């Protein structure tokens, strides 16, 4: 059972997350031949103050 964990900065819309889930599922089905019913995708919404880029939080960078 393929299991993908996706970490993204918070703020994406429900539609964007749905698209990520659909496309990651499709990619795993094509890449490893797993039935789509067996693919799991878990999206982690990371608060901007908890995401660091070059030593600075994404919040401080205005991301």
Curated annotation (Swiss-Prot):
What are the EC numbers? Answer: 5.3.2.6
Q: Which GO terms describe its biological process?
A: salicylic acid catabolic process
Task: Provide the assembly information.
Answer: Homohexamer.
Catalytic positions are 2
- Main function: Catalyzes the ketonization of 2-hydroxymuconate stereoselectively to yield 2-oxo-3-hexenedioate.
- Protein family (similarity comment): Belongs to the 4-oxalocrotonate tautomerase family.
- Pathway(s) annotated for this protein in UniProt: Aromatic compound metabolism; salicylate degradation
The record's catalysed reaction(s) read: (2Z,4E)-2-hydroxyhexa-2,4-dienedioate = (3E)-2-oxohex-3-enedioate
What's one GO MF term for it? isomerase activity
Its keywords, alphabetically, are:
Aromatic hydrocarbons catabolism, Isomerase
Top-tier EC class:
isomerase
Q: Which gene encodes it?
A: aphI
Keyword Phosphoprotein found: no
Recorded protein name is 2-hydroxymuconate tautomerase
| Pfam families named in the record | Tautomerase
Q: Entry's InterPro entries?
A: 4-OT, 4-OT-like_dom, Tautomerase/MIF_sf
Domain of life of the organism encoding this protein: Bacteria
């Amino acid at each position: 059972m393929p299991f993908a964990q996706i970490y993204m900065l918070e703020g994406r819309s429900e539609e964007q997350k749905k698209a990520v889930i659909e496309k990651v599922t499709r990619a795993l089905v094509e890449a490893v031949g797993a039935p789509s019913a067996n693919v799991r995708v878990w999206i982690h919404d990371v608060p901007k103050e908890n995401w660091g880029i070059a030593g600075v939080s994404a919040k401080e960078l205005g991301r």
